[in-house]
Regions:
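C-terminal/domain-edge helix-coil "capping" segments
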Residues: 20-33, 125, 129-203, 211
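A structural "domain/chain start" motif
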Residues: 20-64, 174-177, 189, 203-206, ...
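Amphipathic alpha-helical scaffolding segments comprising HEAT/armadillo-like alpha-solenoid repeats
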Residues: 175-192, 213-225, 244-256, 276-291, ...
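Alpha-helix N-cap/helix-start positions at coil->helix boundaries
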Residues: 196-199, 214, 229-230, 245, ...
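Alpha-solenoid repeat junctions
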Residues: 208-212, 239, 243, 270-278, ...
Length: 358
């Protein structure tokens, strides 16, 4: 049992997201204040190569989008507010971060030291304390002059500012900041709104998993049965991240009989859940699926899952599969087979290591 507990603890450490670790650094008092935020002061700085630019278009976008989640937005610092949401948009971005890598710096929408083109940096201040949450949106070009000429768009500074405004209209920062503040009820309200797009629902489901939000489980179980395959897949992965053991039977059913595109995601979630709880009941369904499916994508996720909860009974089937993949090389024409071989080799090593520890 001690070895199993150690293995599960190692898995939890591997699964813990950067956002989770940062949230754990907040004090209990700070978390309580974040959860009660309603009045948001929006402050925007816009800088082009010509000097200060008009912040009004950015303020309009941010105000409109924050209201989607029910926040009361103010723009006058003299008015009562719970938090200050800062947006700095520049034609040539000036770096304001402190680290090149690690923590949130490794996330795709975090501020980049290397990017010198048009960008908007997003952050917030709680009671005069600048919080570590940082996000950044960038244009798809670095040189606004060249981009404006290619688009025949006139002034490059105006073009850069207009494109940054478009990025803020597309980027779902209101959902991200709401998750950061731990206000799941606002997330649920938007998710439950019939007018919410499928793409946004998928992003929200990902945030439910990020928050390890157990209150989201009923919605995710419904999502698992959705005809919208992207919602179903995202729901499966979020259930794995949240880690409620009583969702294992539903995920097994989804892996065995769900839509073909859903089954790999369900297998992946089972690997996480099984290892988290030391639940070896998932091994037989995984092995049965490995034996009966011809779907390489599903085989890949099943193989990875079997390695996350090493069981001796999985070794023989995995070794047999490994032998059938001896001919596969790293530069093989079929990248799926390369991934399958990698997953099988890794899982066999985990089983061997587990046996050694015992």
């Amino acid at each position: 049992m001690k070895r199993l507990a150690l293995w599960s603890m190692m898995l939890v450490l591997l699964l813990a997201s950067n956002g989770w670790g940062r949230q754990e650094s907040l004090t209990a008092e700070e978390k309580q204040k974040l959860e009660k935020i309603d009045r948001v002061l929006v402050e925007v700085i816009a800088l082009s190569d010509k000097g200060p630019a008009d912040p009004a278009p950015f303020i309009e976008v941010v105000t409109k989008r924050m209201k989607e989640f029910g926040y009361t937005v103010v723009t006058d610092p003299a008015q009562p507010h719970d938090v200050t949401f800062n947006i700095k948009c520049e034609q040539h971005k000036i770096w304001e971060g402190t680290t090149k890598m690690g923590s949130d710096a490794d996330l795709p929408d975090s501020p980049s030291r290397l990017w010198k083109g048009p960008a908007c940096q997003l952050s917030y201040v709680l009671e005069s304390k600048k919080m570590p949450w940082r996000k950044e949106v960038r244009t798809d070009f670095v040189d606004a002059q060249q981009a404006a000429e290619a688009a025949k768009a006139g002034d490059p500074s105006d073009y850069a500012m207009s494109k940054l405004k478009e990025r803020l209209e597309d980027y779902d920062f209101p959902a991200l900041i709401t998750a950061e503040w731990g206000q799941e009820e606002r997330l649920f309200k938007v998710y439950d709104d019939p007018a919410t797009s499928s793409a946004r629902k998928v992003r929200l489901i990902g945030l439910f998993g990020y928050l390890f939000e157990t209150k989201a489980v009923p919605r995710l179980l419904e999502g698992l049965k959705s005809n919208d395959i992207e919602i179903a897949k995202a729901s499966a992965l979020a259930l794995g991240n949240i880690g409620q053991k009583d969702t294992v039977p539903m995920l097994i059913e989804a892996m065995k009989n769900g839509q073909p595109e859903l089954r790999p995601s369900a297998a992946k979630a089972l690997g996480v859940l099984g290892a988290l709880h030391g639940d070896f009941t998932i091994v037989d369904p995984l092995l049965e699926t490995l034996k009966t499916t011809d779907d390489v994508n599903l085989k890949i996720e099943v193989a990875w899952a079997l390695g996350k909860l090493p069981d001796r009974k999985a070794q023989e089937p995995l070794v047999a599969l490994q032998r059938s993949l001896y001919h596969v090389r790293e530069n093989d024409a079929d990248p799926k087979l390369v991934k399958l071989k990698e997953a099988v080799n890794w899982s066999i090593k985990q089983i061997d290591t587990w046996e050694y520890l015992q």
